Amino acid sequence: MEGSNCSLRVNRQLLDPKFESYKLSLDPLPCYNVELDAAVAEVCLRDDQYTLDHMRAFGMYNYLHCNPWIPNSVFYVDQLERVMSFTVTLDTAMGKPIEVFRFPRDLNTCDSRLCSSMYFASAQWVTLSDGTGTLYIIRIGNQSGSVSGKWEIMFNQELGEPFIVVHSVSSVRDELHIIDVLLLSIEKDESDIKGSGFHVCLEWVSIARAQNEDNGKYEILKRRKLFGKSVPHYAAIEPLGNGVMMISYKPFRFIANDKDQPESSEDEKMDEDNKREPLYNWHQTGEDVTLTFQLPEGMTKEDLTIKFLPGEIDISLKDQGTFLKGQLYLDIDCESSAWIIKEGRSVEVTLTKREPGSTWAELVIGDKHGEYIVDPTQTAAIAEQLMHLTSEDMNPNPETEKPPCNAQELEECDLFLEDSTSLCRFDGARLKATHVVNLGSNPYLFTFVATPELMPCFALRHDVDALLWQPVSEQADNLWDHIATFNALGYVQASKQDKKFFTCAPNFSYSALCECVRRIFIYRQPTPVSTELYNRKEGRRVGQVAKQQVASLETTDPIVGFQASNERLFVLTTKKLSVIKVNSTD
């Protein structure tokens, strides 16, 4: 993949190597339930949506949305095709969800409908998808953030196949008010014969209007597409719309200008260069290495200079300079090494190995201009030596004899297969990856918004902890800041096999995860204790304790939405919205 390889810089001051564990607390958690007038518009997967990517994108979708500019405010779409808003003003007097917008068309007539989705690009702008392929840009009339503010359609257009809104931002650039939105869809791929038959499309749409034209019309300014083979864990647009950041299991590539062919990249050009004829060929036996190349036309033996050193070789041609020079893979016997010119102007250089029986992985370290010719007899000998390690038949019962491990003792973290997961930053102008971070040893955990004006944060597992990272596009030398740590949370979440949603408070005071049905687990940051505790094993006083709490809903309906504020958790089922009071208002 293109782009410079980077690494995430962990802030050691945010780590607690002395953290022991979470202590189960039986302190009650007040829970308030609000009955919904109409059920949530949950869209089940169809028979043709059978892949893991369909399940990740649509089957595990979070139907509860938050407005990060308005604390304790959540939104959802019900079966009457209404966008409903719910804001907590007083815990003891919960109101009812209020309709703020209604889709102008019947959504149930679309056979390929997806779930409706939304994202708040700013405090006054919302991007909304009806799940049938139409994108809406909504302006909230009341800038105070009241739920009674008027939602006004400023743009709506059918863009093609159904999609969901992943992220959006609002910015002013070049005297234009631009709303950038990221849309996700899964499309059939007829060329993918061996795979799932689908590919993932992330479309980056820019919609603009002149800033000084209050009554002007919003129009599509630009459309760009990213194609990949896996649903990204994280995807977001930079605040000024200069680039996109993404975490995905498999790489993505840009499709520019709505064409079906990607722009040629430097890597592809390099691949073409690598397909040119090699300058030389070489092969080896147990005793020596033989290098062969053609002498250019018009040159004689006197125009060729070959120097042998124990660990180096230098081949040069008159008037053309160095042909091959560098450090050999292993040392040679200079006195026994020689070269000759054979018929057809072929030069054959024989290098005698100082260590007979050794195998060279390359001729000159780092040189890519030659081609290694495999000796068939050597290949057969190696295959025969490895015969006892291979078989043409699958082992029907691998646990009957010398099992490599006890499968019952493995955790999810031990079975993590996405070793090629990467964090990438794509430049919006060049349509190329500029930064790449390999996350093979740091599994993705969850995404949330800590600061509304910035990009969403993401949490990764580092050893046993969960580390929170804030993308900062303005810092060219360090695009991701480590801003908080949840001790041992990476280890804890790996044990929750039934977990569905994962989030944390914007002020990092607690994290929470919910199962598919009923149970919610809350993990608080360490806080000072009112009474003195003493650790007898280590002989020291304990000044702070990290608490774990468990809440259980009264309903057995599946949980379809989950959001957190600094004071409350919002849990949505198909028929009820539950509000759990976690912290007192500061």
Curated annotation (Swiss-Prot):
Q: Which residues form the CS domain?
A: 275-364
Kindly state one GO CC term assigned in the UniProt record. Answer: cytoplasm
Q: What is this protein called?
A: NudC domain-containing protein 1
- Which UniProt key words apply to this protein? Cytoplasm, Nucleus
Can the keyword Nucleus be found in this entry's annotation? Answer: yes
InterPro entries, per this entry? CS_dom, HSP20-like_chaperone, NUDCD1
Region of interest called Disordered, as start-end residue ranges on this chain: 259-278
Its subcellular locations are: Cytoplasm; Nucleus
**Gene for this chain:** nudcd1
